[in-house]
């Protein structure tokens, strides 16, 4: 028996430090927020405030600390062009009211910037690398993308989605139906919720929560976060989020559904069939630039 104990101790010391130090969390959640040119400074502020308010919500705090491990890890970045992702808050352990409040305060105090194009695919690929170095052992890895337009820069969004799903990263979406005038003159995308549903989201129990306007964003963020933290998305495939009792964060966290089989192929959990095609953003962009300037963007 003593020999086995010594052998076990030697095996532990032989493990890489990263493998020993990884802390178990109920959820590793990457929040990806659109700051492309279609978002004006006021809209960017409303998005930021939506997340700050949500993380200060007592119900969400209880949901975060009420799961099996009582903690989650969160990273927050903003994105625009395929090459432009800005990490505002790196992976942070949220395991108490104090740590959650500090996260919200740091987010509130971060500067707000606006960039140019819309590369959902760039955001997804950036998130894949972000998860690879998270330093946490998570029951679930979830990327949440919010935005007010379809992909028009970088690789096809469906190809980037496949890369993420192959790494067992589920993708949820928070499309913002924006009826405000676009500063570049691009037309509004009334079917953006369907684009996100069919072309962006994927993975077991992935879902879309629609913000009907930027003013509606705080409500949508709160509902989305509660469902993600409590693992209460639909069981099979992506769909619109079901109406849930969201008043008791602790009860939601404790009522989470059983996890899917570890061998589950995440790439099976997508919904094809978006009639305009998942390259619609790229085509709209080319048509717009050709019509307005007689050329296509670089």
PLM regions: where:
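VWA/integrin I-like adhesion module and closely mimicked acidic/polar interface patches used
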Residues: 150-198
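Second-shell loop/turn segments in exported
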Residues: 32-42, 74, 90-91, 106-117, ...
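C-terminal "exit" segments of structured domains
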Residues: 208-298
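Short beta-strand-loop
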Residues: 67-106, 183-196
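DG-centered beta-turn motif at the end of beta-strands
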Residues: 33-36, 127, 139-153, 160, ...
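Bacterial N-terminal signal peptides
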Residues: 5-14
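Von Willebrand factor
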Residues: 23-88, 98-146, 173-184, 191, ...
């Amino acid at each position: 028996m003593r020999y086995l104990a010594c052998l076990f101790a030697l095996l532990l010391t032989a493990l890489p430090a990263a493998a020993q130090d990884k802390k178990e969390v109920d959820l590793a959640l990457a929040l990806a927020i659109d700051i492309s040119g279609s978002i004006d400074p006021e809209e960017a502020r409303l998005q930021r405030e939506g997340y700050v308010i949500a993380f200060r919500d007592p119900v969400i705090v209880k949901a975060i600390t009420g799961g099996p491990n009582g903690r989650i890890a969160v990273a927050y970045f903003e994105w625009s062009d395929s090459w432009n992702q800005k990490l505002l808050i790196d992976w942070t352990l949220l395991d108490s009211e104090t740590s959650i409040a500090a996260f919200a305060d740091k987010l509130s105090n971060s500067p707000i910037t606006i960039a140019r194009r819309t590369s959902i695919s760039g955001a997804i690929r950036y998130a894949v690398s972000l998860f690879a170095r998270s330093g946490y052992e998570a029951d679930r890895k979830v990327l949440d993308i919010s935005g007010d337009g379809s992909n028009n820069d970088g690789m096809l969004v469906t190809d980037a989605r496949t890369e993420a799903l192959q790494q067992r990263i589920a993708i949820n979406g928070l499309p913002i139906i924006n009826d405000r005038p676009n500063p570049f003159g691009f037309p509004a995308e009334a079917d953006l919720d369907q684009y996100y549903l069919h072309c962006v989201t994927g993975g077991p129990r992935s879902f879309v929560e629609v913000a009907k306007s930027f003013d509606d964003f705080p409500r949508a963020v709160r509902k989305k976060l509660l469902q993600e933290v409590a693992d209460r998305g639909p069981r099979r495939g992506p769909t619109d989020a079901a109406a849930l009792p969201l008043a008791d964060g602790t009860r939601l966290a404790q009522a989470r559904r059983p996890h899917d089989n570890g061998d589950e192929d995440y790439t099976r959990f997508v919904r094809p069939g978006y009639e305009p095609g998942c390259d619609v953003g790229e085509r709209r962009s080319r048509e717009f630039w050709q019509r307005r300037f007689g050329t296509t963007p670089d």
